[in-house]
Swiss-Prot record:
The keyword RNA-binding applies. One of its GO terms (biological process) is trans-translation. It is found in: Cytoplasm. Gene3D superfamilies: 2.40.280.10. Keywords: Cytoplasm, RNA-binding. Coiled coil: none annotated. HAMAP family: SmpB. Belongs to the SmpB family. The lineage of its organism: Bacteria, Pseudomonadati, Campylobacterota, Epsilonproteobacteria, Campylobacterales. InterPro entries: SmpB, SsrA-bd_prot, SsrA-bd_prot_CS. GO terms for molecular function: RNA binding. GO terms for cellular component: cytosol. Required for rescue of stalled ribosomes mediated by trans-translation. Binds to transfer-messenger RNA (tmRNA), required for stable association of tmRNA with ribosomes. tmRNA and SmpB together mimic tRNA shape, replacing the anticodon stem-loop with SmpB. tmRNA is encoded by the ssrA gene; the 2 termini fold to resemble tRNA(Ala) and it encodes a 'tag peptide', a short internal open reading frame. During trans-translation Ala-aminoacylated tmRNA acts like a tRNA, entering the A-site of stalled ribosomes, displacing the stalled mRNA. This is SsrA-binding protein.
Length: 150
């Protein structure tokens, strides 16, 4: 699996509870742009609208080498493909538990098909973010000490 775009900010702002794989409906020029690494998921999020799941606010830049007559919107909502039971489960978690859905990555699977890694997440507050940073620093110091010792 080759990651084409990652949402590193989501890992910082949310605690991930469960991840799902979803197909993405794209135009041909968007696929070429994704393979060229011209995507950004920084402020993107996932919503369920009328029983369908959409990736919103994901930025896929236009590639200059593709057809110039048709230029898709760079921040257009992109439909995600999931099984009905998965969508219903996500909808229940979002409405009852107050969780959010976030796009973590766009990647190529083993069959060279572009997929989205969608996560069910809970927002972190400032205290949680600081705690995560402290744990990360402590782990780095422990690794450095182990390296010196060995």
């Amino acid at each position: 699996m080759k990651d084409l775009a990652k949402n590193k900010k989501a890992l910082h702002d949310f605690s991930i509870l469960e991840t799902f794989e979803a197909g993405v409906v794209l135009k041909g020029s968007e696929v070429k742009a994704l393979r060229a690494g011209r995507a950004n998921l920084k402020d993107s999020f996932v919503r369920i609208i009328k029983g369908e799941i959409f990736l919103l606010n994901a930025h896929i830049s236009h590639l200059d080498t593709t057809n110039s007559h048709f230029r898709p919107d760079e921040r257009a909502p992109r439909k995600l493909l999931m099984h009905r039971k998965q969508i219903d489960k996500l909808f229940g978690s979002v409405t009852k538990d107050g969780l959010t859905m976030v796009a973590l990555a766009l990647y190529l699977n083993d069959k060279n098909i572009i997929k989205a890694r969608v996560a069910l997440a809970k927002g972190k507050n400032l205290h949680d973010k600081r705690e995560t940073l402290k744990k990360r620093e402590a782990d780095m110091e422990a690794r450095a000490a182990m390296k010196k010792f060995i």
